[in-house]
Amino acid sequence: RSKQTLKHTFEQIGLIKNNNKVHFFSETHERYAKISLELFLENKFLGVGPKGFKKECVKKYNIEKCNTHPHNIFFQVISELGLLGIIMYIVLISLIIFKFFQCLAKEDSKFLIYLSLFIFLNPFFPSGSLFNNWLLIIHFVSLPYLYVKKYN
């Protein structure tokens, strides 16, 4: 009975369809990920440009498949910013993880800020657009605080 309940729950949230195929969050998220990878392969070095996902997606596919962004920070970075963006993204994520553990070891409360930055930039979960002003303000308003804490 518990297996059926678990399967039903996964079907409800779109992780498994009746054909028992497991999806990356949902069929739609999986489709956006595939489109992002295709756009990346066509524009490896610089990507299609910030906020270019929808424009390029509409050119390549029908409008029903396209959204303003791929709903995942990692896929947005590779499709819109290319290799240059992904290198900066990996460096930034690595720095955030390093600083998080450094602050955690020192019992410094700044680890919470690094944790929130990692959650925002997390490559494993669906997300809003990286170039959405509201999301950027919410998540990066803490950066001046880190600067002040470091030098005071």
Model-derived regions: residue spans:
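Aromatic-rich transmembrane-lumenal/periplasmic boundary elements in polytopic membrane proteins
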Residues: 1-12
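Hydrophobic transmembrane alpha-helices and their immediate junctions
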Residues: 80-120
